């Protein structure tokens, strides 16, 4: 009798296991009309915030993205008041309805000389952050840069 009860319980458990599995994936499929490098291309103007040993300062400036190939974009960082003028290349991809890009090479091969990452939301707002070492007078200082701008 015990064996019969165990068999029935095992069959019921197995049956409930398959009943519990279902298609819960109701996520909409996003169809993009442009590739990531084409959709993200443009000039984004806004404010740079530079933080370092000498405090925090805010400057106006821009970042320009230009398509460089499949999933690649040329990035130009421009902030004359903070002596920032650098060019680099980054990987770029779709992220939900916006874009993300980054370059993790922190060497002189990367024109910025530091790794960086950024995000562009569906409204065209860009956020970028990185830390670099810059010479001010005779000393080298480490500064953290953050950019917030709009296309």
Give the predicted meaning of each segment.
Residues 30-32, 129-151:
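Edge beta-strand at a domain terminus
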Residues 99-135:
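Acidic, glycine-rich flexible loop segments
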Residues 54-94:
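N-terminal glycine/threonine-rich, aromatic-flanked beta-hairpin/loop signature
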Residues 1-8:
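Bacterial N-terminal signal peptides that target proteins for export
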Residues 3, 14-41:
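Bacterial Sec-dependent N-terminal signal peptides
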Residues 61-67, 90-92, 114-121, 146-149:
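Hydrophobic/aromatic beta-strand elements that line small-molecule binding cavities or substrate pockets
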Residues 36-59, 149:
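Tryptophan-anchored aromatic micro-motifs
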Residues 54-56, 79-89, 107-114, 134-142:
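Short, surface-exposed beta-strand/loop "edge" segments at domain boundaries and coil↔beta transitions
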